[in-house]
């Protein structure tokens, strides 16, 4: 649908027919009918008001990962969250509190934390996207989840049109989920995330790939060591976004590792005719286990490098 009215002059710049491909990690996708890049909370309010006055659909865009845009684009207003105030990292006894704007590059924040010798997010290095997207999915990798360090999430509540702060418990964090992608999907727009890190915590080395990486090392790895190790491991799997490398372009891991009853493990082992202990799995509480989706996909006949037509 085309909107013949001209875009009126605003403090916020609203563009028309903006290609979305450059804003996604896949580098594909059609145009946004209207596009606004917001750098302050005031601009965010203004952009929402712009959409409401014209009865436009709203899509909030962060770092552009975990996202596939149709060639037809988006017939509404795309709000690109580019709020990037300086990150605050404040020591408080055995803890460190940090306040981070939603538009901050996630990996850059992880690096900043690790460079100060602080553990808590070192295993989340190399995950594409911005800080504002991390609480939505409760991103996790290599034995860590971002929810373990989040204390507060500041948001714009689209129902009340007011900025509110949601506590850790109010966010309803679970495995790859929160209220932001389930019960309250499309209600809140994240503008800031507060973290708390334990200064006495040791780097997380529970993941098998990390244990193999540091096997035989005499000294205990630092958070920065783990940061670089995780990025190297991700790069080796084609899971690190690297400009100029065609094999390192993706939307991130967009599937969830299934959590199932322990009895399912025996069934899979019988089907594959292998011992159950040969199947990688982790305890998930209350008689349940977590299975790696990538491993299951490969055993189902979709090995690395599988292609179907132009997709693969």
Model segments located where?
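Phosphate/pyrophosphate- and phosphate-bearing ligand-binding catalytic cores of soluble enzymes
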Residues: 15-16, 21-25, 163-312
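Anion-binding (especially nucleotide phosphate/pyrophosphate-binding) glycine-rich loop
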Residues: 2-159
